[in-house]
């Protein structure tokens, strides 16, 4: 059998297959339909956002527009006054630990290099919750830990930094 006759598994193909498998597992671990339906009927979810810059701020505004309760957070929450005003009466701001406690769902929107510290600092508040990690490792910004995350797989690395959460990547 020649090399051209063999099925060649590319990195991209492998990662796509792994991604589909991971998505299937993530969906299987989502709350029961009754829980989601109850939250939907109530009209809103309580969402805590750790990191309210460009990404966290923009997503939070959209969620607020959809009627959800939003807790924006930053190490400098006094700088979020304008963002909270834009988001409306169901929005508030404070420190990251308060956002982690507040949210039924938590969005982490910080540089990937900060993820290990977020996990160490707020793991108890986020335990068992759906946590959305929207960061991506970049070696130029995040240093050697980015190389490690890329090599192991970002989802695997993130799960290690955020123990006990229901991780969405």
Predicted feature descriptions by range:
Residues 60-62, 84-85, 118-123, 143-145:
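Short amphipathic alpha-helical segments
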Residues 135-168:
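Rossmann-fold NAD(P)-binding glycine/threonine-rich loop
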Residues 30-66, 71, 75-80, 90:
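C-terminal segment of N-terminal export signals and the immediately downstream linker at the start
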């Amino acid at each position: 059998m020649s090399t051209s006759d063999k099925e060649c598994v590319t990195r991209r193909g492998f990662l796509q297959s792994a991604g589909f498998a991971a998505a299937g597992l993530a969906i299987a671990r989502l709350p029961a339909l009754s829980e989601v339906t109850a939250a939907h009927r109530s009209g809103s979810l309580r969402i805590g956002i750790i990191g309210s810059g460009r990404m966290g701020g923009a997503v939070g505004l959209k969620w607020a527009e959809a009627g959800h309760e939003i807790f924006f957070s930053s190490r400098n929450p006094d700088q979020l006054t304008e963002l909270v005003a834009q988001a409306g009466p169901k929005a508030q701001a404070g420190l990251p630990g308060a956002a982690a406690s507040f949210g039924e769902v938590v969005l982490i929107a910080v540089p990937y290099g900060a993820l290990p510290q977020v996990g160490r600092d707020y793991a108890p508040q986020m335990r068992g919750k759906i946590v959305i990690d929207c960061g991506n490792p970049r070696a130029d910004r995040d240093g050697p830990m980015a190389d490690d995350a890329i090599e192991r797989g970002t989802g695997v690395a993130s799960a290690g930094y955020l123990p006990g959460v229901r991780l969405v990547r």
